[in-house]
Amino acid sequence: MSYEKNARVINDDIFDLINSCFEKERNSRNINSRCNFFDEYKDYFVLTDDGSYSIKSKEINHKVETLHTSTGAISESFEKFIKPMKFNYNEDIAILDICAGLGYNSSAAIADFIKNSSDSNLQINMVEISKATLACGLLVPSPIPEHDITKKAIENELIKKDYASISYEKCEIPENIDINVYIEDARQTIQNLEDNYYDAIFLDPFSQNMAPELFSLDFFRQFRRVIKDNGIIATYTSSAPVRAGFIESGFHVGQGPIFGRKQGGTLASPNPEVLDKSLPKNDEIRIALSDVGIPFRDPNLNNNSDFILDKRSEVRRNARHNTKISSAVKTPIFLTKKMDDEKLKRRVERNLAKMNIPSTTSKEAFYILECEENYKEKQDLKNNSRNRILDM
């Protein structure tokens, strides 16, 4: 089985229908199958609250996800991936869009660039392993005019790859915008990219349980190599192992915007001063002290999802009660706190006792969390989430 097939996460039915659509286009040299696709198979798409469309994942571990939050697919792109970036549009901008999907994040970046730039240039490198996922971006109605620019870049590459055969998209890509589309495993792409080059990285795969290979510590080390010192990575997830992976690969981390979810996503940068908000205090404690903060590993950037998930589970089991406090009932967040719930207290203190911590209010508990006494939401070079987590 090819890695692309193994890594494929969009719904199998829509995947097959898209492939069939473009096969008809290639065989007939006729655009009708592409033009009629959305109306014919509209039920396979998910209409989000802002009027833009998303698609479903296949069922993995008894779960089905969509590519975007139901609150609004294109709105999510602006809120989570564009607004936190603080681009200086007086200078040229370079963006790496990992798991480009339907092209919404790149389209939002183009819209913001056109609105705010004068004589600067924008380069976007879009990376997506699945031709069908990119092709789906050609089939959905454009949620904003700039999506037509992205569609043209996608179409050009799909024609080069002999997946599409007709140049149908009429929008011209502006001369000061350069869009490169890589249809391959992002782990291989990134190893060939230039050092210290990108102002922003958009990391937008399906969840860590579906694509842990794109959330590994080792993948993030490549991010650290290619991003500029003031560059920012944005991802929707608030996952502890993802944030731990960023920290262990040399990044500072902060909380991203809350949009369509209960928690904010994650922002990462070599420079803490470009990150507005620290992680929530309890998140810092769990990452630092419990086994939930053990990152995903993929040392040679070539393992499959199941292997990475299984290996992390094994490492967690070995670390639990030895080098890490058990994450059960979120044990570490109760350190230094008095507990009224006796049943919960017994469970927490049983976990703590296995690490030679007598109680939640013992001197050991207060010593471990000493650095959190200086917690503040605004980050600076000395007082920030990364430093507090490493101190613990």
Residue ranges and their predicted role:
Residues A200-F202, D229-T237:
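Conserved beta-strand signature within the Rossmann-like core of class I S-adenosyl-L-methionine
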Residues M1-I93, A111-I149, A153-I154, S167:
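Rossmann-like AdoMet
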Residues L102-S107:
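Glycine-rich SAM-binding Motif I of class I
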Residues S2-R8, C21, R26, I31, ...:
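SAM/dcSAM-binding transferase cores
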Residues R243-L267:
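Conserved Class I S-adenosyl-L-methionine
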Residues C136-L193:
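S-adenosyl-L-methionine
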Residues E213-D229:
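A short glycine-rich, Lys/Arg-flanked "PGG" loop and its adjoining helix->strand segment in the class I
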